[in-house]
Curated annotation (Swiss-Prot):
GO terms for cellular component: cytoplasm. The modification N6-methyllysine is found at residues 11, 213. It comes from Sulfolobus sp. (strain RC3). This is NAD-dependent alcohol dehydrogenase. The gene is adh. Keywords: Metal-binding, Methylation, NAD, Oxidoreductase, Zinc. Signal peptide: none annotated. It catalyses: a primary alcohol + NAD(+) = an aldehyde + NADH + H(+); a secondary alcohol + NAD(+) = a ketone + NADH + H(+).
Length: 347
């Protein structure tokens, strides 16, 4: 089968012809119909998430097939698989655990001590077929097609968890930093659907700002031409916001947007751009603000976002579909901030 693989850090991905894996036990072989392109794929190609090196620090073994936003049809199953049939259209939760560690036992499989992350340390979906390690991490699609469903397995699950951690309700105001991207447009929609909060979308390009507005943001700020803090103070009448979801966590965003928080506000840190956090500690105490990390999502988050999308409450904003051979171009678009919404590869 054709597969696009990371062979060497910092180099373009390489299209290879490799063997189709054979499922056994609880494994499922899926014929890939769509694979979303995520900014984590930029970090993988670069070989690091901030200062964390994927090989030396995270234990990734090369070569590896990228692609963790997965939807497709079941091709073959191991003898332990129940509840599914060949030909079923499924989405796959790529953030899997081995099942035995403390975090797996309490339902936080994405924090597993020995994780099985498809497209990271297990071969992913930039290929004609992908081997899913366990059938319990699948969702049988009834209304969504594969292209619509694939981004939900990362951008959807990640922002669903972040919105939950923000503790929103209709009295609250939320800032989404990076609101015009694949994660940002999902965060805006989920926050509206689940929390009913007032949403301020922030981005740095006019096209991205307009995309955030189409996603449902009540207010939008182009931080490249407007003073975001002044605009946030104006919108909130000086109070500040109840939560910020930072999908970048860059030096720039972390130096600006914590200052937008109201008392008892929450700063939800999602992005992996690798900046350090510098904040005057007494202000955390005096204003009772919280800095909260949020990493992808667990199986409950996966089921939650899939059901929300199948009910028509949210929908990924797919802006471009591309061929498998165009994977490097898609990642270039993200790396150079030329992408808005979500790009999806179709093998």
């Amino acid at each position: 089968m054709r597969a696009v693989r990371l062979v060497e850090i910092g180099k373009p991905l390489v299209l290879k012809d490799i063997d189709i894996p054979k499922p056994k036990g609880a494994q499922v072989l899926i014929k890939v119909e769509a694979a979303g392109v995520c900014h984590s794929d930029v970090h993988m190609r670069q070989g690091r998430f901030g200062n964390l090196r994927i090989v030396e620090d995270l234990g990734v073994k090369l070569p590896v097939t990228l692609g963790h936003e997965i939807a497709g049809k079941i091709e073959e199953m191991g003898d332990e698989v129940v509840g599914y049939s060949k030909g079923d259209l499924v989405a796959v939760n790529p953030w899997q655990g081995e099942g035995n560690c403390y975090y797996c036992r309490i339902g936080e499989e994405h924090l597993c001590d020995s994780p099985r992350w498809l497209g990271i340390n297990f071969d992913g979906a930039y290929a004609e077929y992908v081997l899913n390690p366990h059938y319990k991490y699948m969702y049988k699609l009834r209304r969504l097609n594969a292209v619509e469903a694939s981004p939900l397995t990362c951008s959807g699950i990640t922002t669903y968890r972040a919105v939950r951690k923000a503790s929103l309700d209709p009295t609250k105001t939320l800032v989404v930093v990076g609101a015009g991207g694949g994660l940002g447009t999902m965060a805006v929609q989920i926050a509206k659907a689940v929390g009913g909060a007032t949403i301020i979308g922030v981005d740095v390009r006019e096209e991205a700002v307009e995309t955030a507005k189409r996603a449902g943001a009540d207010y939008v700020i182009n931080a490249s031409v407007q003073d975001p803090l002044a605009e946030i103070r104006r919108i909130t009448e000086g109070k500040g916001v109840d939560a910020v979801i930072d999908l970048n966590n860059s030096e720039k965003t972390l130096s600006v947007y914590p200052k937008a928080l109201a008392k008892q506000g929450k700063y939800i840190m999602v992005g992996l751009f690798g900046a350090d956090l510098h904040f005057h500690a007494p202000l955390i105490t005096l204003s009772e603000i919280q800095f909260v990390g949020s990493l992808v999502g667990n199986q409950s988050d996966f089921l939650g976002i899939m059901r929300l999308a199948e009910a028509g409450k949210v929908k990924p904003m797919i802006t471009k579909t591309m061929k498998l051979e165009e994977a490097n171009e898609a990642i270039d678009n993200l790396e150079n901030f030329k992408a808005v919404g979500r790009q999806v590869l179709i093998p």
